[in-house]
């Protein structure tokens, strides 16, 4: 739904800028009406969209393409983007809960099928595209090789909530790590579902409000000079 609202919003704004604004501009030019700063800005944007829309479209396409290319092929860039997103309010929780759900569910399945933990971590590191969690997997393998506990890599790590850490510790100490990982996956899957639903409920009215404000400003900008035009006529 948010995607539909976004497309609809952009469509409405473009329609107003391309078809509505030029009609008012023509009227004001014919009457020699004085134009204020806000109206001039809206007119300039409208003119740019009509005459150079392909430039704006090209810039957007190239920007998306370059960013996608860098994200896919440059590890440092991908890690930086992920680090940035994982420190944003709400977005951080969405990413962490999703990663923990995938990790714990897959890890539980591997353990139940008697896959060695080092091999499991290697598999998990290849499944995730998140560089932060890849590093945790690599560190876990190193710790196991050194004779340390699995949970040592998860201890005090900012990307691992305390609940997840203590459940891993419990599973490790009781010898029921697979069962505990199942519980972790169920818990964080529900957490992820709830936060995504809450985010959708928040975004939808915000987008509608933003559209209303933008459209209102555009309409106000093109109507204000009309009052000056009426005064000139009188």
Write out the residue ranges for each language-model feature.
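Alpha-helical membrane-embedding segments
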Residues: 55-75, 110-126
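Conserved protein kinase catalytic domain
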Residues: 25-28, 39-42, 46, 82-85, ...
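Juxtamembrane helix-loop transition segments at the membrane interface in multi-pass membrane proteins
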Residues: 29-33, 66-87
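Conserved functional loop/turn residues at catalytic and ligand-binding sites
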Residues: 89, 114, 225
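Non-catalytic, surface-exposed connector residues within folded enzymatic/regulatory domains
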Residues: 18, 39, 75-78, 134
């Amino acid at each position: 739904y948010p995607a539909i609202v976004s497309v609809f919003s952009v469509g409405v704004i473009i329609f107003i800028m391309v078809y509505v604004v030029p009609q008012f501009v023509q009227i004001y030019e014919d009457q020699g009406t004085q134009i204020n700063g806000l109206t001039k800005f809206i007119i300039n944007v409208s003119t740019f969209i009509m005459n150079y829309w392909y430039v704006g479209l090209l810039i957007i396409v190239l920007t998306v393409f370059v960013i996608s290319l860098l994200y896919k092929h440059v590890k440092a860039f991908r890690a930086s983007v992920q680090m940035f997103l994982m420190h944003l309010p709400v977005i951080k929780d969405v990413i962490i809960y999703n990663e923990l759900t995938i990790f714990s569910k897959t890890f539980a399945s591997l353990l139940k099928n008697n896959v060695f933990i080092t091999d499991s971590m290697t598999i998990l590191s290849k499944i995730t595209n998140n560089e932060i969690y890849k590093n945790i997997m690599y560190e876990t393998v190193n710790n196991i090789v050194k004779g340390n506990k699995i949970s040592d890599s998860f201890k005090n790590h900012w990307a691992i909530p305390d609940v997840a850490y203590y459940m891993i510790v419990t599973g490790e100490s009781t010898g029921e790590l697979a069962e505990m990982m199942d519980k972790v996956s169920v818990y964080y899957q529900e957490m992820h579902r709830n936060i995504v639903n809450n985010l959708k409920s928040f975004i939808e009215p915000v987008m509608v409000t933003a559209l209303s404000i933008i459209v209102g400003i555009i309409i106000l900008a093109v109507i204000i000079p009309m009052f000056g035009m009426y005064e000139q006529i009188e």
